[in-house]
């Protein structure tokens, strides 16, 4: 049974996130910049050269959203802003971890149709915002968990193909939209961003196809004779390996992403006020503009840099709380010291190896 505190934690994160982000967008002038750009007779991307592509699917509301999306994502992936590119790198480490964990959770029922909710939740995160949907997903996930579902593991075939689903559905579309300008035109990059936006659907689709292909391969005789306990043991070992590999990849991305920040902090990148490296200083990189500050952003790039950090922090706070509530110590009433010590330790791990590493590591501990 889920702790009663989840009824406070996740609604609070959701409402606080909505309040902070909406005030940030208004007070910083970012929302007005959006309005002015779209109202232009010939809307341009933040580089002020590339025309905004406004038709993608032929569905006006969806096309309008995808066009608005370009103002935040294009400067993150086109290499025009060092700080945004580095933030995008950190986002990749987080997305790999979070969506791997979400995919595993959807596969516990062993019903292919449960990949539909995974895809829908993922698309909701992409279209409505990580900071809004992730707290709601975590809340619903904890409310809907049952002891029987906790004990179930995905099939061996499903576990084996998860890396392919992440690679083909998420990593490859991400890499394509980040190709240099001499390989990808401004218009093509906008199409690539629109394709990437739907990566949860591509992950689910690859998972279904790959599992069906793996299932068509005849099992070895030794596997056919495996008992139920033996199958559980094999699947748990495979899931542990998946979690460990995902945690290592996420941690590696985070640690590599810290190198420019540390270099800026110790003066290796000469981060003077007018230098392009100025935003890589730890305080400038990690701390966005406060939501109630009326300092106007200088352009769409700065606005995107602020928004994407709020999005990252708020959604990840929910994911962090989610996996903490799954831990055995949370099921022991009055075990406040153990909970506090666990949270402190995991905050330290997050600073060193990134939130993706911590989230996946905690989900692995849940198997104990």
Ranges and model annotations:
Residues 1-368:
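Long, hydrophobic alpha-helical transmembrane bundles and adjoining juxtamembrane helices/loops
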